[in-house]
From Swiss-Prot:
Enzyme class: transferase
Organism lineage: Bacteria, Pseudomonadati, Pseudomonadota, Alphaproteobacteria, Rhodobacterales
Entry annotated with the keyword tRNA processing: no
The protein, known as: Cytidylate kinase
Encoding gene, per UniProt annotation: cmk
Residues the record lists as binding ATP: G9, P10, A11, A12, A13, G14, K15, G16, T17
Residues that span the membrane, as ranges: none
GO cellular component term, pick one: cytoplasm
Family of the protein in this entry: Belongs to the cytidylate kinase family. Type 1 subfamily.
């Protein structure tokens, strides 16, 4: 039986951290779909046309260095606004979501476009200031020289682009459960997400095979 968990939300809200923790808890494979667009964006920055980059994407591209830089993040947001790029990556994501036993995907349009029939849909969010502080700390720890104000402006510009694009805009699915992590620790956010998913599993009489 397939059991897909869709996690959506803006940058630095915690969806990736929650997705990885839930994957470890339930023994599900996990895909950070944002890495697909970052990998495409990275190729575009090197001079490759966006659609060609999307079609040429390989699993190895998702392991490339430099995918988490602010420059690549902005490029990812820009290529993600292109309908032809999103279409080129659609089957790749849906095939992952259909894995036997279960799968967890996090991104910006998982519950609305990629997996509209997902058994669990979470929309993870947090205030702009909290998200900027998290991303700033992450980037500084990696040696970046950016001000908090610059990071906040970057996040807000990306939010606007993601929410206003005509194709698959960032928004909660109508049946998504919203999880605001602004005042939660990582452990608290993960605990709440797991509890929500566990309750939905019980309602569907689904029992995951957890790792030893």
């Amino acid at each position: 039986m397939n059991f897909a968990i869709a996690i959506d939300g803006p940058a630095a809200a915690g969806k990736g951290t929650i997705g990885r923790a839930m994957a470890a808890h339930f023994g599900f494979p996990h895909m950070d779909t944002g890495l697909l667009y970052r990998a495409v964006g990275r190729r575009v920055l090197s001079g490759m046309p966006a659609l060609e980059a999307a079609r040429a994407l390989t699993p190895e591209d998702l392991q490339a260095d430099g995918l988490r830089t602010a420059e690549v993040g902005q490029a990812a947001s820009q290529v993600a606004a292109l309908p032809q790029v999103r279409a080129a990556l659609l089957d790749f994501q849906r095939a992952f979501a259909q894995r036997a036993g279960g799968a967890i995907l996090d991104g910006r349009d998982i519950g609305t476009v990629i997996c509209p029939d997902a058994a669990v849909k979470l929309f993870v969010t947090a205030s702009d200031d909290v998200r900027a502080q998290r991303r700033h700390a992450e980037l500084i720890s990696k040696g970046a020289d950016l001000t908090l104000e610059a990071v906040l402006a970057d996040l807000q510009a990306r939010d606007a682009r993601d929410m206003q694009r005509a194709d698959a805009p960032l928004k909660p699915a109508e049946d998504a459960m919203v999880l605001d992590t602004s005042r939660l620790s990582i452990d608290e956010a993960v605990e709440k997400a797991i509890a929500l998913a566990t309750a939905r599993m019980a309602a569907r009489e689904f029992s995951p095979i957890r790792p030893n």
